Swiss-Prot record:
Expressed mainly in the brain, with prominent expression in the SCN (at protein level). Residues 1-41, 99-108, 178-204, 286-301 are extracellular. The lineage of its organism: Eukaryota, Metazoa, Chordata, Craniata, Vertebrata. It comes from Mus musculus. Pfam families: 7tm_1. Orphan receptor involved in normal circadian rhythm behavior. Acts through the G-protein subclass G(z)-alpha and has an agonist-independent basal activity to repress cAMP production. Belongs to the G-protein coupled receptor 1 family. One of its GO terms (cellular component) is plasma membrane. This is G-protein coupled receptor 176.
Length: 515
């Protein structure tokens, strides 16, 4: 990627006061030099924007193809191949041309012959892969439209086609090591200062541009024309095919769906932008190779450097904007990132210790728990009958005492300290006395959930309370008032005997016999 003598104006001497004609010529030369320097700064700025935008855009294309299943696996593979070649071309081609465009005499290590040849080889490879990916996508679109119910290109064939693309690019780029002053589409700098006018150089330039640039672009337009003819013929004949690819309600569908039509428009736009941006490159090749013009204009050279690189930025932008499904996926991802970032800001800016009077969802600081709690309140909202039973429940103190007994699990029941109870004679109180789980006051309870041993989203719904057990509106059978009683189900006893009382107050045990 050596120094190109045409980048620097040869007229760099200061004007002399020899004559008026020479002074005018020197002033005009300085004016041209200042314009060239200004245009050089413009090209450097544009290439920096292209470098950043192409990297971000191609990475987003890779992410969208991996995240969504909008297209088939074969189409996704070709699109990923195009995005990878765009990333490689942006990383390898653009930075060094930015350096040489800003200052041709900087970075002496770039001008070493070995380093320059390796970079030119990589430039050729990635440029060739980008161009050869267009006909591969067009071929896949052609088979998808003409044979929608068949799979002409399998996954194995698509992998082989991608391997052929890279092999073709490598073989077409190997002669760069022998011909050092070759310029490609994405990098116009050369490794030698003087252009060689040998026959081998002319043959290589013609063969490369015909086989790697002109023929692939012509194949793309040929496939697009065939697709258009097939679609127009299907619309005229009103062909109705089974809705296997895009199901609809018994409506005649064309060969290509809206999603495929968007992909066709994307491919056509990419190829059109590539052709328009490559016009300065083709002009420069004709000037330096065919017409053998050694001194070309600085403006033509700088334009041939930055304008073809616009296609590196245009390819991902067109893919992300023209396709509606990909655009929706991208917008949804941005919305998710915004929500996640805003949620983190709310949690980080909140106080470390919450007030005890706040709700559990607000104390936790999690929006997920808050949404769950609100949804639970809406689901288990008490009805009018339940509100009446709640009023009766709050007005009866005896009923509250019974509710305390029934709300505690077995083995943990303790009668309320309302009055000392005396056990009947001849009985032994074998149940252990355990203090309740939560201290309870003898006053009126604040709400109907105060007797339940739950917290937050684990509070029991009103349909499971004892006053509504006989109602038809309950959701589940009354297995208990606490989660422990819900889990502990009683196993029915087998071969239970019957006890009958006789006239002499004697208990007789009769075994139960199956009749």
């Amino acid at each position: 990627m050596g120094h190109n003598s045409s980048w620097v104006s040869p007229n760099t001497s200061h004007p002399r006061n020899t004559s008026g004609a020479e002074a005018g010529a020197n002033l005009s030369a300085f004016g041209e030099l200042s314009e060239a320097q200004l245009y050089r700064q413009f090209t450097t700025t544009v290439q920096v924007v292209i470098f950043i935008g192409s990297l971000l855009g191609n990475f987003m294309v890779l992410w969208s193809t991996c995240r969504t299943t909008v297209f088939k696996s074969v189409t996704n593979r070709f699109i990923k191949n195009l995005a990878c070649s765009g990333i490689c071309a942006s990383v390898v081609c653009v930075p060094f041309d930015i350096i040489l465009s800003s200052s041709p005499h900087c970075c002496w290590w770039i001008y070493t012959m070995l380093f320059c040849k390796v970079l030119k080889f990589l430039h050729k490879v990635f440029c060739s892969v980008t161009v050869l990916s267009f006909p591969a996508i067009a071929l896949d679109r052609y088979y998808s439209v003409l044979y929608p119910l068949e799979r002409k290109i399998s996954d194995a064939k698509s992998r082989e086609l991608v391997m052929y693309i890279w092999a073709h690019a490598v073989v077409a780029s190997v002669p760069v090591f022998a011909v050092t002053n070759v310029a490609d589409i994405y990098a116009m700098s050369t490794c030698t200062e003087v252009w060689s006018n040998s026959l081998g150089h002319l043959v290589y330039v013609l063969i490369y541009n015909v086989t790697t640039v002109i023929v692939p672009v012509a194949v793309v337009f040929l496939f697009l024309i065939l697709i258009r003819r097939a679609l127009s013929a299907s619309q005229k004949k009103k062909v109705i095919i089974a809705a296997l690819r895009t199901p609809q309600n018994t409506i005649s569908i064309p060969y290509a769906s809206q999603r495929e039509a968007e992909l066709h428009a994307t491919l056509l736009s990419m190829v059109t932008v590539f052709i328009l941006c490559s016009v300065p490159y083709a002009t420069l090749v004709v000037y330096q190779t065919v017409l053998n013009v050694p001194n070309t204009s600085v403006f033509l050279l700088l334009t041939a450097i930055w304008l073809p690189k616009v296609s590196l930025l245009a390819n991902p932008v067109l893919f992300l904007t023209v396709n509606k499904s990909v655009r929706k996926c991208l917008v949804g991802t941005l919305v998710q990132l915004h929500h996640r970032y805003s949620r983190r800001n709310v949690v980080s800016t909140g106080s470390g210790v919450a007030e005890p009077s706040l709700e559990p969802s607000m104390r936790s600081g999690s929006q997920l728990l808050e949404m769950f709690h609100i949804g639970q309140q809406q689901i288990f909202k008490p009805s009018e009958d339940e509100e009446e039973s709640e009023a009766k429940y709050l007005g009866s103190a005896d009923f509250q005492a019974k509710e305390v007994l029934t709300s505690c699990p077995e083995g943990e029941q303790e009668p309320p300290q309302l009055a000392p109870s005396v056990p009947p004679p001849g009985t032994v109180d074998s149940e252990p006395r355990v203090s309740p789980v939560a201290p309870m006051e003898s006053g009126i309870f604040p709400d109907k959930y105060s007797l339940q041993f739950g917290f937050g989203p684990f509070e029991l719904p009103p349909q499971w309370l004892s006053e509504t057990r006989n109602s038809k509106k309950r959701l589940l059978p009354p297995l208990g008032n606490t989660p422990e009683e819900l889990i502990q189900t009683k196993v029915p006893r087998v071969n239970r005997v019957e006890r009958k009382m006789s006239r002499n107050n004697k208990v007789s045990i009769f075994p139960k016999v199956d009749s």
